């Protein structure tokens, strides 16, 4: 049986949390009307991306009342969205939550914080320190927030832990021109999505935002890619759009039988080499 999922390719307002909460209710209602069991929002969809000194003003703890409307909306379909988390030790994190049946069931803190070019994540936020899978409406899932997905270890770790669904919330600006005239960022992201989907035999839900902040345009192009590398659905570039597609757990099983790369992966060799590089002892005991 297939599972209908949705991506809310939206344009959050910078620093306007209450306005963005209202926007979320609209998109969640649209996803519900479309029959989706899960709707994924982009990175920092509750706050906007280029926050800089505003980050501390919009940060919330996981039990903050501002997140209650998201929890309430998740009673009949799962919701994943991004916000600035203020941790118990007062650190600020770029976070993506996953709510189901009225409860926050998982939070991923962005691990890789780009601080180069037009990006300033590392100046205002602390990094996460783990990649953990969790049960979702579409199967066992992992979250890679934007830059996380540009490090191949991220989806590899999720797939090794049993993930069949990779959620990729993003706030990716449109940059560069690829050969043939396509947007350079789009070409890179699409190549990455297809590679991870096909070689890790899982579904990729890439949820990118649109709109403008500080003269930077976010390009959208959200997409759903199947574990055989085929495109399920893709949103237009630069325009808001509710993208809806089907996830088929049986296809994951068929592809993993046909293309058993994960079955044959030698995690012990990977671990031994990493341990050696870090100067750690590694002794595998069968």
Where are these regions (language model features)?
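Cys-nucleophile CN-hydrolase/nitrilase-fold catalytic domain and related Cys-dependent amidase chemistry
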Residues: 17, 26-110, 172-195, 199-202
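Active-site catalytic loop in hydrolytic enzyme cores
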Residues: 62-65, 87-192, 257-261
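Short beta-strand scaffold segments in enzyme catalytic cores
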Residues: 81-83, 94-98, 132, 222-224, ...
């Amino acid at each position: 049986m297939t599972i209908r999922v949705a991506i809310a390719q939206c344009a959050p307002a910078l620093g306007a949390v209450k306005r963005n909460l209202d926007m979320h209710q609209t998109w969640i209602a649209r996803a519900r009307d479309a029959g989706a069991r899960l709707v994924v929002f982009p990175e920092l969809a509750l706050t906007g991306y280029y926050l800089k000194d505003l980050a501390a003003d919009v940060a919330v703890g996981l039990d903050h009342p501002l997140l209650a409307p998201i929890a309430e909306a998740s009673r009949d379909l799962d919701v994943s969205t991004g916000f600035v988390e203020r941790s118990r030790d007062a650190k600020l994190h770029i976070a993506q939550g996953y709510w189901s049946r009225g409860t926050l069931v998982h939070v991923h803190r962005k691990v890789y914080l780009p601080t180069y070019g037009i990006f300033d994540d590392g100046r205002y936020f602390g990094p996460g320190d783990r990649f953990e899978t969790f049960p979702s409406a579409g199967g066992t899932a992992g979250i890679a927030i934007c830059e996380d997905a540009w490090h191949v270890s991220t989806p590899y770790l999720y797939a090794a832990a049993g993930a069949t669904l990779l959620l990729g919330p993003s706030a990716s600006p449109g940059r560069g021109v690829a050969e043939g005239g396509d947007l350079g960022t789009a070409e890179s992201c699409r190549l990455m999505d297809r590679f991870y989907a096909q070689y890790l035999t899982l579904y990729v839900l890439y949820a990118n935002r649109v709109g403008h902040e500080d003269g930077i345009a976010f390009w959208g192009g959200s997409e759903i890619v199947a574990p055989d590398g085929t495109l399920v659905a893709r949103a237009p570039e630069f325009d808001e759009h509710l993208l809806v597609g089907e996830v088929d757990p049986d296809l994951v099983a068929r592809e993993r039988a046909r293309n058993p790369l994960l079955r044959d992966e030698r995690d012990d060799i990977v671990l031994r080499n990493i341990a050696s590089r870090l100067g750690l002892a590694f002794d595998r005991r069968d």
